[in-house]
Every structure is written in C-alpha cells, then in structure tokens.
Amino acid sequence: MRNPVILALCILQSPALLAQAPIPDWCRMLPRPEYKTLERIPVSDRWFEVYQPAPSVFAIYEPHQWEETIGYLIVGEKRALQFDTGMGIGDIKKVTSELTSRPLVVLNSHTHPDHVGGNWEFDTVHGMDTEFTRRNARGSREAAQAEIAPDHVCGSLPKGFDPKTYATRPWKISAYTRDGDRFDLGGRTIEVIATPGHTPDSISLLDRANGLLFTGDTYYPGTIYLSSPETDLDAYGASIHRLAALAPGLKLVLGAHNVPVAPPTVLQRLASAFDKVRAGKATLTPDSPGNVIYKVDGFSFLMRAPVGH
C-alpha cells in the first residue's frame, strides 16, 4: 500500500480475525476500483490475485499485504519471463505453473525484499552485476519479519505459512544481466533497461513490439519511495527521463505496486514533476522520522528530509 490516503472497505476472511485486531487503515482502500476493468484469471493460491492487462501478460498481485506488490509473468511462444517474485508469503511458483508450462527465467526489477521473496523457488534467476544485488541474494530475516506485522497484513496469512520462520530466503544468481540485454521468449523480445536510482540494481523491461513498459519501483501509481540509503536521486532523475523518451511508442506502463496499468503519458509528467522537486518547486510535508513527502502535479515522492527539517 504505497499511498498514504485511505478510503474504502477491506473484507476480512473470518469474523474471528475481525475480533482479534482492528482493520489496518490501508486495508480500507481495497478493493481498488481500477481492477474492475481488468480480466481476472483464477488461480488456486488465494494469497494472490491474477489479472491479464495485455495478451500473454499476467499481473500477479498480493493485495493482502500493505506493499501490494505486483509481479509480471510475460509469456512467449517458447519461453516465459517472471519479472519479480513478490513477498515469498504465498507460493508464486505454483501460480506461474498454473499459468504456463514454458521454461521460465526470473528477473527482478530490483532486489528489495518485497520483490525477491520467491526467487529461491526458481532454477534460473538473472541479476544485475552489482554488490547490492549480491548482498541481497544472501537473504535476510529482519526486513521480512517487519512486513508481516499485524498492521501490514489485511486478513489472514496463507494456510501453512509460519510467521516465526518467515524470511527472505537466499537464492542463486544464475547469470548477470546488463543494460541492453534481450530475452527472446519466442515471438516476443524483452529488452532490459537499466534504471538505477531507487536502488543501484533497478531495471525496467521493454516489450517494444507490443508497446509495454514494465517499470518496477521506478514508477507505480502511489507515493514513490526514494528515501533508502541506497537511493541515488540524480540517477533516478536520469532514469525517468530515459523512460519518458520511450512514451510515444508505448501502449501501457506496468508498475510494481498498487495498480498494474497506467497510460504512457504518465512518464513525461513524472519526469517533469520530479524536476520540480529537485528545483525546490514542490510542497514539502513531514513524514516518518528523517523523511518528508514532496507533492507536485499529482505525484508524491517520499525522500530523506533536507538539512534543517
């Protein structure tokens, strides 16, 4: 739930759960109305909801955890590519197996824990050649445990899930990926675009022939998080301008949180809004300790507080 504004109703899975804990504020935003326009694909694991925003593209959404992470299964005639594997709370490999039987490679938009939780389940995982990537591939427990705090979960966790042992499990990097690499899925080519900024290893994926751009955490509808120690604001600005230049050839922009589809024009507006933030032309409001939110032209950015705030 990468958005501080809370509105609608979340339906909990049992009256007992309702009695045990209050409904988290972010949960009241659900279900998001944008999903009504998308085709939903049934899968057996109820932790996930799967939607089809474009032909042979499946948005694998985790609505029951506050990150509302979205991974994408992109299917070609011979192979498939999974862009992000989510929180590692549900069984994402089981979901992908229900959607395709083609050989599958995993790529991550970046290696924050909410995007790599299911990596360990897959045999072939490519990663960017950065120390940040290698360090995160060792796994971690502390960050994962924070993600299942009571106010971070809407409803119940999956049957068989053990909160006490939950961690981001280590995974093996099968091969390194670089800017400009292409993945031939058979009748569909996916291009890797390095978009550092949010993290050093952030990437976007371009399906040029079909006009699809998968942006990870470089863009998604909601407050964009740029407050981590690994964030580089100059690199982020350069990356979003690079993506904005692609907008004329796009049909859809597909981000990694909240809602899976946005119009391509959002990229130019995003770049313009961020330029205003850097130029001191955005409204600043305090947020969590050490952080502020800048708001301008319908966008909001969570960033480290400037000196003196």
Predicted regions and their residues:
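Metallo-beta-lactamase
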Residues: 34-47, 51-55, 80-82, 87-88, 128-193, 199, ...
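Active-site HxH/HxHxD metal-binding segment of metal-dependent hydrolases
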Residues: 89-184, 221, 265, 270-283
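Positively charged n-region of N-terminal signal peptides that target proteins for export
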Residues: 1-4
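Accessory terminal helices/loops
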Residues: 17-41, 238-309
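Conserved beta-strand hairpin/beta-sheet module of binuclear metal-dependent hydrolase folds
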Residues: 44-98, 205-220
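Alpha-helical assembly-interface signal, strongest on the long, hydrophobic N-terminal helix that forms
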Residues: 8-11
